[in-house]
Swiss-Prot record:
Enzyme Commission number(s) of this protein: 2.1.1.177
Protein name: Putative ribosomal RNA large subunit methyltransferase H
UniProt xrefs under CDD domains: RlmH-like
Taxonomic lineage from the root: Archaea, Methanobacteriati, Methanobacteriota, Methanomada group, Methanococci
Cellular component per GO, a single term: cytoplasm
GO molecular-function terms, A-Z: rRNA (pseudouridine-N3-)-methyltransferase activity
Gene: rlmH
Amino acid sequence: MNITIISVGKIKEKYLSDAINEYSKRISRYSKLDIIEVADEKTPESPSDVEKSKILEKEAERILKHLKKDSFVITLEILGKEVTSESLAKKINDLSISGKSDITFIIGGSLGLSKNISEISDFKLSFSKMTFPHQLMRVILLEQIYRSFRIINGEPYHK
């Protein structure tokens, strides 16, 4: 299994970097993991709809450069489907069993993801109806991927 996380924006806070490194190390027991950061666009304080659209398209271009053709794409979106940890584990396991060895998770920037990226998504995932900082979402996603592998392998995990 190969898992790629494409995320818009750089992690600046050490505590988030530490958590990302820890979960990356834990996941490496189960899967190859690549984390790709693409640059985010500077967003004005009160961007117009046109400015938002241009920003999202520029970020989408950067994301698409790193997307593998045969990868199963899971986008993190507010309007995506909310699932349990067990359901996410089942999804990952089912993909592996069906021969999909590459999964790419995409995390947008502060404005989310462009329509173009959303349209190529094989599965739209939401962690909550609440909004989280995209940097923190990377940690939350990694924890859930790690938890998924623990569940798949019948190993204990915190409930």
